[in-house]
Amino acid sequence: MPKPKNEGYLGNINVKRQGVSEEWTDDKVQEYLKCTRDPSYFISTYLKIISLDEGLVPFKLYDYQQNLIEHFNDNRFNIVLACRQSGKSITVCAYLLWYLLFHPEQTVAILANKGATAREMLSRITTMLENVPFFLQPGTKALNKGSIDFENNSRIIASATTTSSIRGLSVNLLYLDEFAFVENAEPFYTGTYPCLLYTSDAADDPAS
């Protein structure tokens, strides 16, 4: 379904700007509820990724990727040890986007050993967002290389792993990429963990 040009965010017709109303049908409501309840369904039905061989293609999850998503959704803490080019990072990006779209008032942080790595993941999330139908997008208030703010008051930030990366923030979901290569990992962890520990929803949120 084509997206109205005048409803896009700052000239990007594929990202819905804030303040755009949606005409809800019974089918849209049912589909929205289904996506809310099942991240794997939302990802495999609506998200697209860039393939080196085929360009933009639907994100068809392998069994192990579905298992990853289930673990993310069912457990507060997750550690993933996997080989390179196994599709783990793109799976994380897809899960984070689902979490942001269907969970209002949440703050998500992507931290990596290099700021460029974290921003690259945010860029992948933006590409996925651009292919989501408008009725599933909450509307975007701000979008740049380092963060996205949605109309449902959820937001995501990308930064390097330093002790002050997310200081002062209350983070509902934190993703640490390339953590094996983080220098001074212990002071970083002790400086970052309270941002999760003192988040009001953290104790109840299995995805944090």
Residue ranges of each PLM-predicted region?
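Phosphate/NTP-binding elements of NTP-utilizing enzymes
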Residues: 2-200, 208
